[in-house]
Regions:
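Extracellular, luminal, or virion-exposed ectodomains of exported proteins
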Residues: 1-12, 26, 81-88, 95-98, ...
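A glycine-/polar-enriched beta->alpha junction
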Residues: 61-71, 78-87, 94-98, 116, ...
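Charged, solvent-exposed structural "stalk/scaffold" segments
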Residues: 1-14, 116-164, 179
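Short, solvent-exposed, mixed-charge loop/turn linkers that connect secondary-structure elements
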Residues: 17-58, 175-189
Length: 189
């Protein structure tokens, strides 16, 4: 079973590297490069967990104020004479406000979940590091087989990949939330 776990972990690591390479190529093409170009891709900064000071109430207010489509419809509503057109526009503005508020709430919840997932993955990686250190000592003392040692190394690689992926998801959720607050929350669907 140890050999199986080691092989499984190595396969997971190889699969992760393959997915990473596919994503890198997609990113290169999406940003206007040729698929076989080799631009230098830097690290994506992960938001500092302790520095997140999101306030959904004030952010909701800011998102409503910053949304261009909502502001345009409000101006149209002010300049529309009474009647069916005004009623329809009024309903559109109210529905748009509700949709923006709901979008902010969904993105905030996604951000909080991504932050939790990131923290958990970070802790799992730390524990895998400690386990590998202990396994290295046991291996040096002859108390652990080479296969078990390789399995621990593969598990550490797997946990590191999971931590990095959760960090990227955390960053994406953070950016999505910030852009929604800055006026790009869903208004019409």
């Amino acid at each position: 079973t140890t050999l199986f776990r080691s092989c499984t972990a190595q396969a997971a690591e190889a699969s992760g590297k393959t997915k990473q390479e596919e994503l890198r190529r997609q990113l290169i093409v999406m940003t206007g490069w040729q698929y076989d170009d080799l631009p230098r891709l830097g690290e994506i900064p992960i938001p500092e967990e302790a520095l997140l000071e999101e306030d959904p109430e004030s952010d909701r207010t800011q998102a409503l104020a910053a949304n261009f489509s909502l502001a345009a419809d409000r101006r149209r509503l002010e300049n529309t004479d009474s009647g069916t057109a005004k009623d329809v526009l009024n309903q559109k503005v109210e529905a748009g406000q509700q949709k923006i508020e709901a979008d902010i709430e969904v993105k905030y919840n996604s951000l909080m979940q991504a932050q939790t997932d990131y923290g958990q993955a970070k802790e799992e990686y730390r524990l895998a590091e400690e386990k590998l250190e202990a396994d290295e000592r046991r291996y040096q003392l002859g108390l652990l087989s080479a296969n078990d040692r390789m399995a621990a190394q593969a598990e550490l690689s797997s946990k590191k990949a999971a931590w990095e992926i959760s960090g990227l998801s955390f960053r994406q959720a953070y950016e999505d939330y910030q852009w929604a607050v800055e006026g790009l929350a869903a208004y019409e669907g």
